[in-house]
């Protein structure tokens, strides 16, 4: 799987399950749009590759590892409830799932707290793809 195919597979699943499935605005790296101006819950999604290893000798076969980082933001006055619910939905959509040639591992949810005028919760999703 090429890097382009990998990123597209992850973004497609995130769009289907979270952006569309949960009706949440999602911004990806290098997205020219900014956060929603109406104060609604939104997500910044980044895909970071870590290691690539060769899994077979002979014709090249490689396994790519990395993490998807979903930074969830919502108005401070609403607290963390909606963000933690969304983090749970992300966990259900990815944890232990194989889709589009990508295998997702155990999801970690990290409440961050107040960030500017918003409350933040981060979700980390490890992945592997061949």
Which sequence ranges carry the predicted segments?
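Sterically constrained small-residue positions within well-ordered secondary structures
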Residues: 36, 59-61, 112-116
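Short capping loops/turns at secondary-structure boundaries
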Residues: 3, 83, 114-118
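Acidic-leaning, charged glycine-interspersed low-complexity segments
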Residues: 16, 88-130
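Oligomerization/assembly interface segments of phage tail-like spikes and tubes
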Residues: 60-77, 119-130
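Low-complexity, flexible helical/coil segments
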Residues: 61-64, 77-86, 103-110
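Small/polar-rich, solvent-exposed N-terminal microdomains that initiate assembly or binding
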Residues: 1-58, 78, 84-89, 97
């Amino acid at each position: 799987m090429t890097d382009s195919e990998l990123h597209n597979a992850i973004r497609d699943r995130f769009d289907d399950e979270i952006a569309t499935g949960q009706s949440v605005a999602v911004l990806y790296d290098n997205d020219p749009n900014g956060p929603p101006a109406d104060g609604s819950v939104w997500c910044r999604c980044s895909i970071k590759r870590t290691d690539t290893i060769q899994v077979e000798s002979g014709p090249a076969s490689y396994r790519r590892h990395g993490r998807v980082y979903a930074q969830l933001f919502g108005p401070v006055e609403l607290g963390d409830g909606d963000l933690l619910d969304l983090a749970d939905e992300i966990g259900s959509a990815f944890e232990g799932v194989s889709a589009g040639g990508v295998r997702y591992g155990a999801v970690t949810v990290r409440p961050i707290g107040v960030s500017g005028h918003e409350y933040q919760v981060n979700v980390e999703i490890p992945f592997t793809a061949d």
